[in-house]
């Protein structure tokens, strides 16, 4: 897909053929999933004997997540006190969305219990799938806050060593050890830029205001990379940490907004995730692509708007944005179900016979 988007292959016919191949493989994967849908239903047995156990598991996950969500709220508040606003931007709204998903899950877990008591197999399966989807997305949102706290601690611990490694790179460049063939004026300009970046980061470290350690690492590694000396291990580590964090953040956002995010953001993120991240240059590319994918995904969500804006059903708009519900029935359903394009919406509300 990267080659197609960049205009390769060069011939229009070859590009069309490449796209036809991609579409064909996707269609075949969908057919295989559709063919296995009935077997998946049989394995889970949500309309019958498997429902009780599946409900117990979902309720257990729900209870654990409710406690983690409270802790994540406190964690995020502490991060906002300690770091610059940009540091927590990737998880802005995550705790609130997790709470919204859990409220939605509560309603459907309760409805599942009532359906089991009424021997309503269809209602049991439909409500339980909706609850499971909401719980799964709440876990992604809460885990994102917890993981970002870890990444920020790792980055803050790495910044001093990254500054030291960057200084060594600058010294090497000043002594003519750059691998790039640069004119003296260009080399001096790049050295001056890198000096300015490092000075700004040092000022942030010693200043009274909070700073963003991941952004500091991004600026350090990219400024020094332009000198092309041959990166030290600590700078590679820093670049990889930044890229990994961007990939994780973008993947979380796309996953919990899959009902609104379009193919462009998905393709770019998939491409970034598949690229082997070995060394700083590859890390820069992955970081850039992941951030671009996140930006495209956010644009898609804004363009989509809030579904069912007048609903009184708690959590319904978020469930539709998240792709938990497919918005094909009047109540926002059916819930997305394991299968391909022809079967993933098979849990429709059945019309009275």
Predicted features and spans:
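Long, charged/polar, soluble alpha-helical segments
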Residues: 1-353
């Amino acid at each position: 897909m990267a080659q197609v988007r960049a205009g390769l292959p060069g011939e229009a016919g070859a590009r069309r053929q490449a796209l036809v191949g991609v579409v064909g493989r996707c269609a075949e994967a969908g057919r295989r999933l559709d063919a296995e849908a009935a077997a998946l239903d049989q394995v889970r047995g949500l309309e019958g004997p498997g429902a009780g156990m599946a409900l117990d598991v979902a309720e257990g996950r729900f209870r654990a997540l409710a406690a983690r969500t409270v802790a994540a709220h406190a964690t995020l508040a502490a991060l906002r006190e300690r770091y610059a606003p940009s540091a927590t931007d990737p998880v802005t709204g995550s705790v609130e969305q997790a709470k919204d998903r859990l409220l939605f899950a509560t309603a459907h877990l309760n409805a599942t219990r009532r359906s089991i008591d009424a021997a309503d197999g269809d209602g049991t399966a439909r409500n339980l799938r909706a609850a499971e989807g909401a719980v799964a997305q709440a876990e992604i949102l809460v885990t994102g806050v917890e993981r970002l706290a870890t990444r920020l601690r790792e980055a803050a611990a790495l910044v001093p060593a990254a500054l030291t490694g960057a200084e060594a790179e600058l010294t090497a460049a000043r002594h003519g050890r750059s691998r790039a063939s640069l004119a003296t004026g260009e080399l001096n300009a790049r050295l001056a830029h890198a000096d300015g970046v490092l000075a700004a980061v040092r000022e942030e470290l010693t200043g009274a205001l909070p700073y963003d350690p991941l952004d500091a690492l991004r600026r350090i590694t990219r400024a020094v990379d332009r000198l092309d000396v041959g990166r030290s291990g600590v700078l590679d580590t820093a670049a990889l940490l930044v890229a990994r964090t961007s990939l994780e953040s973008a993947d979380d956002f796309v996953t919990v907004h899959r009902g609104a995010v379009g193919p462009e953001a998905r393709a770019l993120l998939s491409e970034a995730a598949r690229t082997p991240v070995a060394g700083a240059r590859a890390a820069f590319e992955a970081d850039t692509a992941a951030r671009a994918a996140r930006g495209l995904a956010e644009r898609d969500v804004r363009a989509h708007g809030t579904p069912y804006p007048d609903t009184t059903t708690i959590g319904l708009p978020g469930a539709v944005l998240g792709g938990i519900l497919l918005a094909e029935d009047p109540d926002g359903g059916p819930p997305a179900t394991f299968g391909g394009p022809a079967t993933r919406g098979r849990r429709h509300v059945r019309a009275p016979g």
